């Protein structure tokens, strides 16, 4: 595994892991308690201008409907546990060797090799490129058809606050709700504030999105910071006084622009395949950026297991796209609009999903959360292997 960072100073905030992704993590023996994961039992969409609840049960009965809870987890805690599972000697398969401070500067899809910044050339049976929204690997796949990611007009601020800071303040103590995610809207969809706990409900995570932030001096680096007073300056225009009191506690605020790209027609070429933001960058409105990358990893893990002949790789990658590309493309479309998602956007997403109707928010949640990438991948592989056995036996 080639990683351009040092992995020594990981930063970030929390993310949500919806049932479609949590089933994968649990299958990998991720232990929620070891990462301080919070099972989110309730969710609501609230008019942030007057604090009226618009949709009280946005994620109602997650466990009974989809068999698994929705989790919130600090991304550093999740990364730490995933890295341990990948590199430790215990467990199935060979431990992964992580080569840090190695930035890839060029890809060769046909030769299955990469060149790093220091001139080192590395070869493999298959390159799995997870190089983000500004992927350079995507040009190897699409050639001159490549479409660069661009500004969306949206920017976001993120911060974390210890729960005790709210509980010790009479003005905010009553607003703390364990195991709950809340989405506050502003007038005209100009902004949104997402609030949920992480780290065993001991830390509150905030994501403030808007098209009205001054982004003239803001880049895409999520490590960039602004003064803690900046979120409140905007919140005074967007939200009710009660919510302003919450935003006032912001500290160590990170601020960056959000970029996106529409769906692309293919995710692989020769012996190079795109995953994650390199394949399907999306905004945060469905909370599926990380979840879709997890689905990518799960599908590839199953489809490439016990491949002993390079000649099998192409067929397996075609299966990967069959399982993942239309779904990832639909999620891109659904994710790039402030919820609740309008019917026109649901219709555009449904064009990628033959046999599925997305007539309501409930339809969207049902499609997104009920999908079992593990079962889909195993079933597709079983069909392929059955055909291969029949062919080898001489019946075809």
Swiss-Prot record:
Keywords: FAD, Flavoprotein, Monooxygenase, Oxidoreductase, Virulence. Its cofactor is FAD. GO terms for molecular function: FAD binding; monooxygenase activity. The active site is at 158, 196. Its EC number is 1.-.-.-. InterPro entries: FAD-bd (IPR002938), FAD-dep_Monooxygenase_BioMet (IPR050493), FAD/NAD-bd_sf (IPR036188). It is an enzyme of class 1 (oxidoreductase). FAD binds at residues 3, 277, 290. FAD-dependent monooxygenase; part of the gene cluster that mediates the biosynthesis of the phomopsins, a group of hexapeptide mycotoxins which infects lupins and causes lupinosis disease in livestock. The role of phomE' within the phomopsins biosynthesis pathway has still to be determined. The pathway starts with the processing of the precursor phomA by several endopeptidases including kexin proteases as well as the cluster-specific S41 family peptidase phomP1 and the oligopeptidase phomG to produce 10 identical copies of the hexapeptide Tyr-Val-Ile-Pro-Ile-Asp. Belongs to the paxM FAD-dependent monooxygenase family. Monomer. This is FAD-dependent monooxygenase phomE'. It comes from Diaporthe leptostromiformis.
